[in-house]
From Swiss-Prot:
Species per Swiss-Prot/TrEMBL record: Rickettsia rickettsii (strain Sheila Smith)
Cofactor: how bound: Binds 2 Zn(2+) ions per monomer.
Protein name, per record: Chaperone protein DnaJ
Family matches, as CDD domains: DnaJ (cd06257), DnaJ_C (cd10747), DnaJ_zf (cd10719)
Residues the record lists as binding Zn(2+) 1: C149, C152, C202, C205
Amino acid sequence: MSQNYYQILGVSKTASQADLKKAYLKLAKQYHPDTTDAKDAEKKFKAINAAYDVLKDEQKRAAYDRLGHDAFQNQQSRGGGGNHGGFHPDINDIFGDFFSDFMGGSRRSSRPTSAKVRGSDLKYNLTINLEEAFHGIEKNINFSSAVKCNTCHGSGSEKGETVTTCDACSGVGATRMQQGFFTIEQACHKCQGNGHIIKNPCKKCHGMGRYHKQRNLSVNIPAGVENGTRIRHTGEGEAGIRGGNSGDLYVDITIKPHDIYKVDGANLHCKLPISFVNAALGGEIEVPVIEGGKVSLTIPAGTQNGDQLRLRSKGMSKMRSTIRGDMLTHIHVEVPKNLSKRQRELLEEFKKESINEKENDGSFFNKMKSLWS
């Protein structure tokens, strides 16, 4: 009586996939024709590959356990599937370095496309204003995408019809052809690599399990988002083919330039015009802030044009943090162009008082030099 596949690999029927692979690699290395001169090495090597080819595949293994060794082999020979004892792909774990060097450092996989294909990822460009970036916001976006067919529920088959397993490849979606020591794996010609046959395709999706439509999706933009941030929405991309997993949606954020503020990380910069009187005497003025409303800013006496005053924690919010940046005000001292008679008289008095400072002496020229240094 011939050995069954579990006996060939020396494992129990409850062996895990990890145990199967470990046993296979050990035996394949032991009986590979290039590593031993034993007379029966080639025969054992083929038997080891045939056993692992079936047991590593959950569907094949289940069928093997259900039918038994002899009945399963008969079905395989009728269906045309199976490895038939050639090189199994996992043999690369043993001889990978050798083949990589021999083939110029490249080993390419020729595995066929499976029946279920993951949907494509999508990208959406979303423009928001600075206030929305500060507070965070829910935005509704519209885009075209492939969605799961609601008639066949992604199977690709007309409602009520069953999908049959391809008898040419036993549902694997691939056939193997032996050429010397190498096994070439290619997509099954009968099912085009799907592993099953759809005899009556769904009319709505034409057997693809999905179709295109306009979608409306609400996306959450967190407070403190920065320009150029990419937000991933898992599973909101295109639906997969024939029940495959959906891709992801990536929302790329662009923040529109603001009329008042310039953004520098979490800090905000703005120009603040003040009168020359406030600059000279100092005082309190109200300035607008990004969250809305105004706050009081102290102007020190003698403030010069171009001075920078900081409002702590009045900048942008930081994503996933309670910390805020600062707002930096750049002072612009405004000189009045049209003076009333009384204003001119007061300035003339101020000018006379200032003569004592002797602006035409050496200190005046030193001040001029400092402005250019």
